[in-house]
């Protein structure tokens, strides 16, 4: 580029460099989209806009991609590196430039015909200034329409700092030429497909128009389901039809979101400022798979785990910056207090009560509102656990909203619904101190403005945040596979509950929890906490801690928990340095070196972070515990022991493997432990390696408390085979609390009611307890003896003496 064009672009770039602060999606286009910068790259934009072109150029230069203003030279021929699909509108409408996109596409394809080694990567790029979807009434022009020069000037002036450059996966022109030819009709088809691509991309980024709230309420009131519920309300409560209708409208006011794009923009500015000061980074993985689903027209339902009230804001912020529409979020009614309630409502929150029981009108209004969101094409987010996890582990799922999601499909007419499991991880959760108090029996404090201000005042260095998108679950595909005749239950009017609904919803919920855990994120904090809590003194020298972290990191990198899980790329030493900056640990220095200590008062709180990744390490920890106890053991006997205990672990921690997959996993882990020098393999036997016994023992300690808990329940069951399930849960908790006090077990989940409830249900499913309540004493004693070998003798004596004392 030379002469006047260079001067023109430089002059135009001056105001743009001040007014425009754009963000690239994805954040690092070349590696994330697999672009090969050694091969020619050309850019395709939807319509002629010099502002878009210069905004694209700034992002290309920032990410070491070719400059779109520099032409491509191929076989001595100079071609523009960018193509505008459409000339775009002009201020003076009588002047319409001739479109050149088809000619340029044809020129590029023709070069591939004459040069068999040429392979140009065509990268579609859209530049967006603002993403307001608009309202259903009152706007003649659609949002994100093509703008003429004057309109574009005002868009840049007002929305320049809310702009995104969206790079799409490249298309190989070599493949196009080889498979479809190079004539002009193929060039026309390419331009037509590109137009459709950009139209879909705009819809994925902006979403459908927002309804006028009153119009939405009127439509809901007119639905047959709500009309019938209003009649039933009037009849059952002996009130007038008008009064019952007012009750329904009041419920809609309580439930419905009041989405505002301007509030999204304002909050994005505030959160961007806040995150940069509180977090050292927010790590996002696998967002491209979600963008592709949105582009393909799927109705997206985000199903994250629930760690903190921060989840609502963090996930919406991340989705917005990934070029996706912030979802409508199901939030607990406890958050509907001033000023948080009105703010959350304008950010897309709709409010849900803890229980629907006994209120048919409420359940009908809520179900119809949710169905309306789906039918209009809005993305939705809800927390399938129902509440925030107090222990750091996933809670058993609550299936009410999930059931309504499938019922929405059974009304027909919705786009394909796809569930997106999401793992959210933190290095600091602001509520963790409150969680520990609640687990010890304190009453949950009601959410309020003073409580919110107290929480905000405590926000300091929060370390890193993690948002990992798990494997999507297309509901239609799932139902086709597991309930082939599900379409026979479609009823566009009534909410139906076919016989298959409840078991199917339960299976989907369990599968979602597994997929959330599959996307787990190991980080400096949870790895250091895992190692220090494994030490009985909660302290290790820096060398020991480094060695232990290397053990965890190598296990996770060389035998990954799943393809969606993430492990830090930093070294063990760098992770320790980062964790020490979080001010959770103490360091004692002496002449020999540093000792890193987890203070007693912090130990209980730090179990939360350890539990975030317990599922990723529990199997190697169990193997280490078995090998440590036996000193040497054959693979077959090791496999038998793991097989006995695995169903309990799988149910408790939502582990991913089926029983028939265990042999391969155990072999891979055993080989990795041998590679690390933790064990030696001789004649198909696993032996302890004495020179690395401490590392193996610390690895084994990761399963210690879980095995102690199982030992309690199996001993109680063996001692009293006719004990009923409720009493078994209660007595297990009592013994666990006693064990916790006598042996200094710091984990509050050690005697958590939900953990024992889940365990007892698994024992029934595995046949250790019959439906009549009686246990199989021979089987339970056999398992107890296996567990008794894996726990220390003093803990075993406490368990056995506690139950004898009760007898």
Swiss-Prot record:
GO cellular component, one term: plasma membrane
Motif (HXXXXD motif): 305-310
GO BP annotations, alphabetical order: CDP-diacylglycerol biosynthetic process; fatty acid metabolic process
Topology class, membrane: Peripheral membrane protein
One MF annotation (Gene Ontology) recorded for this entry: glycerol-3-phosphate O-acyltransferase activity
Pathway: Phospholipid metabolism; CDP-diacylglycerol biosynthesis; CDP-diacylglycerol from sn-glycerol 3-phosphate: step 1/3
UniProt EC number: 2.3.1.15
Entry keywords, A to Z: Acyltransferase, Cell inner membrane, Cell membrane, Lipid biosynthesis, Lipid metabolism, Membrane, Phospholipid biosynthesis, Phospholipid metabolism, Transferase
Enzyme class: transferase
Catalytic function, reaction form: sn-glycerol 3-phosphate + an acyl-CoA = a 1-acyl-sn-glycero-3-phosphate + CoA
Family: Belongs to the GPAT/DAPAT family.
Protein's name according to its UniProt entry: Glycerol-3-phosphate acyltransferase
Organism from which the protein derives: Shigella boydii serotype 18 (strain CDC 3083-94 / BS512)
